[in-house]
Amino acid sequence: MEDFKMKTLAAFLSLLVLCWAQEEAKLTKANNRFGLRLLRALPSGPEKNVFFSPYSVSAAMGMAFAGARGQTQQELSQGLGFSDVDLTDAGVLDAYTHHTERLKSTPSNSTLDVANAAAIQRTLALLNSYESALQSSFGAELHKVDFAGEPQAAVDFVNNWVKRKTHDKIEKLFNEPLDPDTLLVLLNAIYFKGEWNTAFVKEHTEKRQFFNGGVTPVEVDTMRLEARIKYRFFDDLQVEVVELPYRGLDYTMAILLPKENTGVEGLKQNLTVDRFQNYLSDLRERKITVLLPKFKLETKYSLKAPLQSLGIKQIFESGADLSGINDERLRVSAVEHKAVVEVNEEGTVAAATTGVVIVPYSLGPEPVVFRVDHPFLFFIRNTRTDDIFFVGQVNKL
């Protein structure tokens, strides 16, 4: 009888692990789909680069989702892609719980630090259930501040938290004190540092042409690497794809270079998560020469309008239902996102932070030259979990 009990328990635990893995995979797919949709919604053009962390935005909005109810929660579920992958409301929080723990516990040769926090007006009492969700599902730190009485000290606290969690790569998220009526700021910060598995040799870096906007030639520092790397050209979107691994091989940078100099916008509009994943699965290792510009991007976005264009609307209006946070009538007034990335011969350093402000109411024998000399897309991802942590579009250098 005891032997039967043990077998039953083991089977039950295995089933739980399988369910958790399935929920995490759904969350990753939802976040990645959301990232591509947000990429299309953000302003871009020949003179404007794009860089952001879909994971950071999704995590911050996920903390708002935990306190949303009714239509507000439904819009978030649809806009963030949860409903598209059949994630239930409870399933979202369970998936975040186990995914957050796995990212923290998985050993890696690269550095990935993800942190969540809530800066809470000291007079605001959060519902116990919401505090529990923030801490258990997101590992969030809870901090009391005084946006009304000590606005400068409050914003300084938020900015110092951001600076610390991004290893000083982002100095501040907010340039001035927030509205004194602010009751809650939900924060996510993400920092990545990875060394190339095969480093570019500094002595091989030299000035080469890059066509800004696909048409205007400029001379930029361009790195050179000859190695066996995963590569392929895909006819459907007329795009070359290279995947550059970081040391340890658990993180990579995938670079998508359209054949046409001005083809990046069309590529962006037609790229889907499934197509992206299929591209990566179909890559083949071969000897190639990579010519990649060194670059550093710094971006800041107010995400209210882009999120509204994705159908997330009511949370910003007076009729928002955030009754899972507190009994008061609350609404989100702003979603601010800041990101920075630097790519050089050694590797990549990237960081991003999001703040949600809540107020009342083909293979061949010949070597290939992968010449990145015109606008392109890039993605920094985890090969174990398939999470896309950072997305960029380089139009101008």
UniProtKB/Swiss-Prot annotation:
Induction: Induced by blood feeding. Keywords: Glycoprotein, Hemostasis impairing toxin, Immunity, Platelet aggregation inhibiting toxin, Protease inhibitor, Secreted, Serine protease inhibitor, Signal, Toxin. It is found in: Secreted. InterPro entries: Serpin_CS, Serpin_dom, Serpin_fam, Serpin_sf, Serpin_sf_1, Serpin_sf_2. PROSITE patterns: SERPIN. Residues 1-21 form the signal peptide. Pfam families: Serpin (PF00079). GO terms for molecular function: serine-type endopeptidase inhibitor activity; toxin activity. GO terms for cellular component: extracellular space. GO terms for biological process: immune system process. Serine protease inhibitor that modulates blood feeding of ticks on vertebrate species. Inhibits host trypsin, thrombin (F2), alpha-chymotrypsin, cathepsin G (CTSG) and mast cell chymase (CMA1). Inhibits host cathepsin G- and thrombin-induced platelet aggregation. Inhibits acute inflammation in the host. Suppresses neutrophil recruitment in inflamed area. Does not inhibit host plasmin (PLG), factor Xa (F10), factor XIa (F11), elastase and proteinase 3/myeloblastin (PRTN3). (Microbial infection) Inhibits IL6 production by mouse splenic dendritic cells in response to Borrelia burgdorferi exposure. Decreases levels of STAT3 phosphorylation in mouse splenic dendritic cells in response to Borrelia burgdorferi exposure and in Borrelia-primed CD4+ T-lymphocytes. Inhibits differentiation of mouse Th17 cells, a subset of CD4+ T-lymphocytes that play a crucial role in protection against extracellular bacteria, in response to Borrelia burgdorferi exposure via inhibition of the IL6/STAT3 signaling pathway. Interacts with mouse MCPT4. This is Iripin-2. It comes from Ixodes ricinus (Common tick).
